[in-house]
Every structure is written in structure tokens, then in C-alpha cells.
């Protein structure tokens, strides 16, 4: 019989290198058990096929998980031309095979160009987007006819890193909500041969541009060695580095923590991260054009290290 896990309050961000074949939620729960963290959340799903950076938020850090969900991201994608699948990736069932035309690098660059910028993109039918309160993938698995939603997404850059027919590799930098599977599918149609994702790796998520990731295997080994894996957590403040920052003295910080609005013409307008004078994160706020700071999310029980 397995010993019962005693969970504990733990605050911080773990930069997990998600393995292929595991859902984002299963990866989160595995890490949460290893850390013995009471509360955890992830910052946006990676497809089971995908590997790479999955920031996991624990404790008070879960209050900024939604902000990281909306951050810019970068992916390395391997695309196979000539075959379409029902999931738009290699995990799905083949639907159609077509011959791949002779393609020069210039032709590929020209085909990729319309996918850069703000574009309309139809989500895969096998996706976690909900329709009528139910994920699309659940409907697709039952064989229902689905019209996946078309949404505006932003692709900042696409770099063709290699091409050896029928495989090409891309580095894609994009905004929140972009499906690389959809990009591969649509590129295949532009080229007239169809395509699907063979491999996908997320390499960074703002603000973690050069992440030092840890695998579940390494995390397990660390725990089994008797070490406290909490040392791997980044402080909550690490997830706030892209925000304008306001530092308050003890009196004003106490008022802010009680939900009171503060006013100072010197406050930068927009969403801000608010810190105590000792460097501990107090919360997130919104400053209007008149310098009024309104609390949005308040952090509780964090010291200057903010990950303990």
C-alpha cells in the first residue's frame, strides 16, 4: 500500500519539460504529487504529442497562471507534407495521401508569408476548446460532425530551419491561442499536398525566454534522493518580470493588501506588479489615466523570496 502523501503550502513556478504522450494536466498532477504541493495549475495546455516548456504554478503563483496563458510562445515544429490526419498530427488516423510537389526554399517562404501577422485560424476538431460546455475532442471522439471555431490569432515570426522532402522544420513565434497543428494543416493545403505535425516542442514562454527546464524523470530522481524539490521553484516574482513595477512603503502596501485604491500621478498607467519595500510581491493592480491604482489580484503569505 502506498504511503499517504502529506501535501503542503508551496508557492512558486516550476519550468517543466513535458514529455511526449502525456497530457498537460497529467504532467501537472505528477509534478504536484512529487512536490507535495497543495494547489497547482498549468499555464495553457500542450498537446499530448508535444514536448517542452510547461510552466506550472503552485500556491499563490496560480493567481498569475492566466496571465502566462496569454503570453507569447515559441515552438519548434516538424511537419510532414503529403499526409493529412484527423487530429492534424502524427497521433491521428491518416485521412488522405497526396504527392508532394517539388518545392524550393523560395516557394516555401512564399507559402509561409501569409501566415505571419494577425490571421484567421480554424482550430483543430481535436482540441480542448469547448462548444456547448464540452471539449471539441470529446465530440470528435464520438464521431459527431463539428464545425471548429475560427479565431483571430497572431503569428509573430516563422523561420524555415530545414527542408528535406517531405519533412520541413519551422521555428514559430506566436501569441496565445495559436494552434501549430492548424498552421501545418493550412500550409499543406496552400501547397496542395496536405500536411500534419510530426513533432512539436515548445521552447519558451514569456517571460521565460531561456528556461532551465526539468523533466519528470529528473524531478522524481531528486525526490527519491531525499532532496527537497521545492528548491527548483522560481519565485512568484519571476512571472511578473514583464510588468511595470511599483514599490510601496509598509503603510501603503498594507492598504493595498486590504483592497484599498491608492493614487499617485507617478504611477505608470496600465497593469502593474506591486511590491512591498522588502521586495515581496503584494499583488497585481491596474493604474488608470489619473494615477489611481486599483488592486486586481493580491498575494498572501509571500516573503521576498516568494517561493517558500
Curated annotation (Swiss-Prot):
SUPFAM superfamilies in the record: Pseudouridine synthase, PUA domain-like
Active site, renumbered: 47
UniProt signal peptide: none
Protein name: tRNA pseudouridine synthase B
MF-aspect GO terms: pseudouridine synthase activity; RNA binding; tRNA pseudouridine(55) synthase activity
EC number: 5.4.99.25
Function: Responsible for synthesis of pseudouridine from uracil-55 in the psi GC loop of transfer RNAs.
UniProt keyword terms in alphabetical order: Isomerase, tRNA processing
Amino acid at each position: 500500500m502506498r504511503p499517504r502523501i502529506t501535501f503542503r503550502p508551496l508557492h512558486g513556478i516550476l519550468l517543466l519539460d513535458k514529455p511526449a504522450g502525456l497530457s498537460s494536466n497529467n504532467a501537472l498532477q505528477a509534478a504536484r504529487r512529487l512536490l507535495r504541493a497543495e494547489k497547482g495549475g498549468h499555464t495553457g495546455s500542450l498537446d499530448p504529442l508535444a514536448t517542452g516548456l510547461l510552466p506550472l504554478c503552485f500556491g499563490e503563483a496560480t493567481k498569475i497562471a492566466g496571465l502566462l496563458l496569454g503570453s507569447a510562445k515559441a515552438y519548434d515544429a516538424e511537419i510532414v507534407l503529403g499526409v493529412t490526419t484527423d487530429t492534424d498530427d502524427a497521433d491521428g488516423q491518416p485521412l488522405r495521401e497526396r504527392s508532394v510537389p517539388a518545392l524550393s526554399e523560395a516557394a516555401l517562404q512564399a507559402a509561409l508569408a501569409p501566415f505571419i501577422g494577425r490571421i484567421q485560424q480554424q482550430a483543430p476538431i481535436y482540441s480542448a476548446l469547448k462548444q456547448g460546455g464540452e471539449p471539441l475532442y470529446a465530440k470528435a471522439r464520438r464521431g459527431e460532425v463539428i464545425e471548429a471555431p475560427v479565431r483571430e490569432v497572431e503569428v509573430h515570426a516563422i523561420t524555415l530551419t530545414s527542408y528535406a522532402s517531405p519533412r520541413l522544420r519551422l521555428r514559430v513565434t506566436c501569441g496565445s491561442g495559436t494552434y501549430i497543428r492548424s498552421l501545418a494543416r493550412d500550409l499543406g493545403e496552400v501547397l496542395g499536398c496536405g500536411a500534419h505535425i510530426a513533432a512539436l516542442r515548445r521552447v519558451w514562454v514569456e517571460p521565460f525566454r531561456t528556461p532551465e527546464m526539468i523533466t519528470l524523470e529528473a524531478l522524481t530522481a531528486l525526490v527519491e534522493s531525499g532532496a527537497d524539490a521545492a528548491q527548483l521553484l522560481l519565485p512568484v516574482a519571476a512571472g511578473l518580470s514583464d510588468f511595470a513595477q511599483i514599490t510601496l512603503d509598509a503603510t501603503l502596501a498594507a492598504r493595498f493588501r486590504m483592497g484599498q485604491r491608492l493614487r499617485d500621478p507617478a504611477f505608470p498607467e496600465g497593469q502593474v506588479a506591486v511590491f512591498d519595500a522588502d521586495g515581496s510581491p503584494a499583488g497585481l493592480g491596474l493604474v488608470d489615466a489619473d494615477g489611481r491604482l486599483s488592486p486586481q489580484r493580491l498575494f498572501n503569505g509571500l516573503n521576498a523570496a516568494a517561493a517558500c
